[in-house]
Every structure is written in structure tokens, then in C-alpha cells.
Amino acid sequence: MSDEDLFLTALLDSLGKEVNTVLNNSPIKVEEKDGDFKAEDIPSPSSDTWVKLPEVVAVVCDLKGSTHLGTGKHDTSTARIYKSGVEGAVRVFHEFGANFIDIQGDGGFGLFWGERAHERALCAGVTIRTFSEEFVERLEKRWPEGLPETGYKVGIHAARTLVKRIGTKREISEQEAVWAGRPVNYAAKCAQSADRHQVIITQAVWDKMKDNDFIAFSCDCGDGPTANLWTDVTVDRLPEEDRDAVVLNSPWCKTCGPAFCEAIMAGEKKRDIPSAVRTGINRMKMQKALEAKRLRDSSRNSALRGVR
């Protein structure tokens, strides 16, 4: 047997033993932390401890068509596009106080927990969507021909998660924080399902936001506040029971956006909304609830017919 064969055989044998040890004998400790937990305190690979955070809001941004952005351009031009786009999104996460930021190729994600995590996350998501449109306008001016359709797609989800740094011990460059749970996974699937300049948030997040008038209703510009700012959407990439979501197509209003963002971040929730508009959104909620009940009843009846 050659040295290469011996190396591979030994490596696979060692990996198998390590997996068996971790699955059956390795001590694992889970510590629940509150909103004051700091990302720099995430346990290292040498620790047996995982940290559990009861609720983390993940905002994932994904740049549409990024694989084609370098086609026909010089390396320096491609680098400028990535630098300006990705750094712009990362700065948004930073400015809205993301507790953890991870850059992944043409995008990344920000994680929010603690005080007003949902509000900070939503404002960050809408701001990235707004930045996306302005970013693309600048790209189109710089390269009026041959630019692929691009722009940020944003997804948001919230749930509990476990976190720990995993990788090669004593090799910092080979270690990363692993977020085990649904927040990043679901938010990424929402972003993948969105089109450019869209924000998709899961029903779990919308349930926390729908009673905030600064979020649920459009601003007073034009025809005044309306209840059609968000529309229902189904995220087929998610498990069937979690596919309900809503999508936002609009950026921050140039006139009202700064004040609305400030109000949301300050925890304000109520505006002077005409009763007819408020009744309209309540009617839509009722129609959605009735439709969901109809689907549940239909599924239950089909199941009963199947066992007769």
C-alpha cells in the first residue's frame, strides 16, 4: 500500500473515531444566555459548551446575479463592485447595532438579539433594500451596457439558536461561529426566494411587527396611509408549516423614511391611521385566517377519507 493510501485510510479512520466519540461520549453543555450576551464570548472550539439564545433575528442579504457581475469587466472593476456593494450592506448592519455580522461572498447576514432586536433588524433590512436600489442606479450609470440584473434580496426570520465556534483548534483562521438553528437558514431561504429590491419576512417575524403602525401601513405621502404596503407570499423553500410570509417592495420614503425609522428604533408604535384603512388591514387578516382554516379543514377531510 502506498503512502497516499495509508494517509487516506488513516485520516478516514481517525474521522470515524472522532465522530463516534462526539456522538456517544463527548460531554456537551448548553448554557442559556439573555440579550446582554456578547458575540466575543462565543465559546471556542476547545470548549464543550454551546450557548443558547432564546430568540435571534437574522437578516440575510444576497446580491442577485453576482456571478455575472465580473463578466466582460476588468478585475479592478469587479473588485470595486463587490467592495462598494458588500461593504455598504455590512455598514448598514453595523449602524443598526447587529450583535454579529458575517460576510459571505456577495452578501452576508446580521444577527440581532436583546433590546429591540426585531425593530433594529427590520430597519436594517429595509435600509439594505433602499441602498440596493441606489447602488444599482450607480452601477448602471458606470456601466450603461452589459450589466446583469442585480440588487440585494433580503430575508428575515427569528427563532432560538445555539452557537459555538467550530474548527481547527489553535488555528484562528480555520475557526468560525456556527449558528445551529432556524434563524439564518430560514432567512437565507427567504432571501433566495425574493427578487432584487425585495424584503421577505416570515410569519413569525410579521406577527411581532404587524401591530406597529409605522411598519404595517405606508406613510402619509400621496394618497395617505394604505394597508397594502406588505403583501402575502409563500416561501416554497421552507417546510410546509412555515411557508407563510410577507414581502415588501418599497424602499424608505425619501420624505418620511428618516422619521419613520427613528420612530421604529425608539419603540413607537401608534400613528393616526384612518379607521377605514385600519379596518381594511383587519379584514385582510380575517380573510387570511379563514383561508388557512379552510385549507386545514380540507387537509383533515382528505386524511379522513384516506383511512376509511
From Swiss-Prot:
* Catalytically driven reaction(s): GTP = 3',5'-cyclic GMP + diphosphate; UTP = 3',5'-cyclic UMP + diphosphate
Question: One cellular component GO annotation, for this chain's record?
Answer: cytoplasm
Q: What is its EC number?
A: 4.6.1.2, 4.6.1.26
Residues annotated for Mn(2+) 2 binding in this entry: 62, 106
Lyase listed as a keyword? yes
Q: Which GO terms describe its biological process?
A: defense response to virus
- Write out the annotated subcellular location: Cytoplasm
Function, as annotated: Pycsar (pyrimidine cyclase system for antiphage resistance) provides immunity against bacteriophage. The pyrimidine cyclase (PycC) synthesizes cyclic nucleotides in response to infection; these serve as specific second messenger signals. The signals activate the adjacent effector, leading to bacterial cell death and abortive phage infection. A clade D Pycsar system. The pyrimidine cyclase gene of a two-gene Pycsar system, generates cyclic UMP (cUMP) from UTP as well as cGMP from GTP to a lesser extent, has little to no activity on ATP or CTP. Expression of this and adjacent effector PtPycTM (AC A0A4Q9KQH5) probably confers resistance to bacteriophage. The genes are probably only expressed in response to bacteriophage infection.
- Assembly and interactions? Homodimer.
Family affiliation:
Belongs to the adenylyl cyclase class-4/guanylyl cyclase family. Pyrimidine cyclase subfamily.
Query: What name is this protein filed under?
Result: Uridylate cyclase
Query: Gene symbol?
Result: pycC
